[in-house]
Amino acid sequence: MRPFSGSDCLKPVTEGINRAFGAKEPWQVATITATTVLGGVWLWTVICQDENLYIRGKRQFFKFAKKIPAVRRQVETELAKAKNDFETEIKKSNAHLTYSETLPEKGLSKEEILRLVDEHLKTGHYNWRDGRVSGAVYGYKPDLVELVTEVYGKASYTNPLHADLFPGVCKMEAEVVRMACNLFHGNSASCGTMTTGGTESIVMAMKAYRDFAREYKGITRPNIVVPKTVHAAFDKGGQYFNIHVRSVDVDPETYEVDIKKFKRAINRNTILLVGSAPNFPYGTIDDIEAIAALGVKYDIPVHVDACLGSFVVALVRNAGYKLRPFDFEVKGVTSISADTHKYGFAPKGSSVILYSDKKYKDHQFTVTTDWPGGVYGSPTVNGSRAGGIIAACWATMMSFGYDGYLEATKRIVDTARYIERGVRDIDGIFIFGKPATSVIALGSNVFDIFRLSDSLCKLGWNLNALQFPSGIHLCVTDMHTQPGVADKFIADVRSCTAEIMKDPGQPVVGKMALYGMAQSIPDRSVIGEVTRLFLHSMYYTPSQK
């Protein structure tokens, strides 16, 4: 008896194919085969893209709809109106200033330049010095400004790209990184670099993990898994480096990422898991220990974004407040981003990206070995970097010292908790989740919360507007720890809310109405176009068309 072979299983299939194509010409067989293969490849491409069919279909629908003449004219009319509104606001803000669109024929004197600088710095609609602004300016001490101004002046010409010329500046950067590593419980293997801000810290981490995964795991279609509340810089990094960002819903009660959904979002192309400490919208901290455990289980690096939390989140437990572990003391955490220009109180333009091991930092670097100009390497996005900013950051940290930062942390978090207690019992509003450090986010189930924002704005307060769901938040800084500021905020929130509650059904009007309207527009590309027009308006000059 003939032994059974694999070809016996295929025989019915081959015979069926031969019967189906037996009466066809060779060119027909080739055409059908090619069409079937190409059709299968196309179908696979359509189904297996990073975005699901619903999102892609919705985008294509709106793209087609905007080509309809009547729709296109309406969109163009609204965009033109938005452009005019933005430019009108800029003109109004700078009405008392003269625009310089060409170089002065002869250079201006020191006195004239300083006079013009003072004029420019006096513009603005809010008094940040009196603690009326959410975030933005995290601390202001004249003696510290005097110190960093002098330090920056001494180091303004330096550039760590030229390490042989300015080794002292390189040493300062190394010390800033090491001091930050120690604050976040890094060991002797921890390392990192300074950057120009939180966004660069985040995108550098994404670049490092993309390259690391490509070299050691062969991943060429990378994705990262993040909470929906994570900073928009991760979306920017995704656009820059062709990394798909998989956003996961947060729990509607805690406003921390839903760990079960987070786990389901991980796949074989995931190169990074991300958590916030805290997130920008609500000031809550994700369960970093749970995220890190997933990282260990699936051998995926874990990044903690502490850009907003900065040195406050690093020291809040030492200041007497309870907080779950979130930094390098958690097994599985491989990197942390933190802004020294926020609660490190350094001048704007300084942040750090920290790694648990140099094997990750190594992939952050860009190295070109075959350039005719020589072997070229740079640690961050910029080649030339401002040594003056590095020196000023270093000087700020040396000036504050550990005790100074601990005292500032206690002041800020004490004030934030005081404000939280004061507004939590106000009828008509609620607080999103449990604020972990300095951000307090307010919402309402009774009235449009943007009415409260508008009322507070008229009293001189400048808060951040949130969407999906609607909310506003106050990011408490050292400016709010000044005597009377917290009490004034609580009193104004209470009185404004009481007035709104007399007629809670009234719609919001004025500028804040735009935020509510923006959320209701299903075609988010239109909102994107409006945002681009706003960004263009920031560069307005009278002669520009």
UniProtKB/Swiss-Prot annotation:
Keywords in UniProt for this one? Developmental protein, Endoplasmic reticulum, Lipid metabolism, Lyase, Membrane, Pyridoxal phosphate, Signal-anchor, Sphingolipid metabolism, Transmembrane, Transmembrane helix
Explain the consequences of disrupting this gene.
Flies lacking Sply display decreased viability associated with altered nephrocytes morphology. Altered lipid metabolism with accumulation of sphingosine-1-phosphate upstream intermediates is observed.
Q: Name one GO molecular function term.
A: pyridoxal phosphate binding
Per the UniProt entry, the effect of E119G is: No effect on function in sphingolipid catabolic process
Q: Does the keyword rRNA-binding apply?
A: no
Q: Which residues cross the membrane?
A: 27-47
Q: Which residues lie on this side of the membrane: Cytoplasmic?
A: 48-545
Give residues where N6-(pyridoxal phosphate)lysine occurs. K342
- Catalysed reaction equations from the record: sphinganine 1-phosphate = hexadecanal + phosphoethanolamine
Q: Provide Lumenal-side residue ranges.
A: 1-26
Expression tissues: Localized to the developing gut primordium during embryogenesis.
Q: What cofactor is needed?
A: pyridoxal 5'-phosphate
Q: Which domain of life is it from?
A: Eukaryota
GO BP terms: namely: adult somatic muscle development; carboxylic acid metabolic process; sphingolipid catabolic process
The cross-references to Pfam families, in alphabetical order and at most eight, read: Pyridoxal_deC (PF00282)
List its EC numbers: 4.1.2.27
Q: Which GO terms describe its cellular component?
A: endoplasmic reticulum; endoplasmic reticulum membrane; membrane
Lipid bilayer topology: Single-pass type III membrane protein
User: Pathway listed for it?
Assistant: Lipid metabolism; sphingolipid metabolism
In terms of SUPFAM superfamilies, this protein maps to: PLP-dependent transferases (SSF53383)
The consequence of S335I is:
Loss of function in sphingolipid catabolic process
Which top class of enzyme applies to this chain? lyase
> Record's family?
Belongs to the group II decarboxylase family. Sphingosine-1-phosphate lyase subfamily.
Q: Briefly, what is this protein's role?
A: Cleaves phosphorylated sphingoid bases (PSBs), such as sphingosine-1-phosphate, into fatty aldehydes and phosphoethanolamine. Sphingolipid catabolism is required for normal development including viability, reproduction and muscle development.
Tell me which PANTHER family the record gives: PTHR42735, SPHINGOSINE-1-PHOSPHATE LYASE 1
Name of the protein in question? Sphingosine-1-phosphate lyase
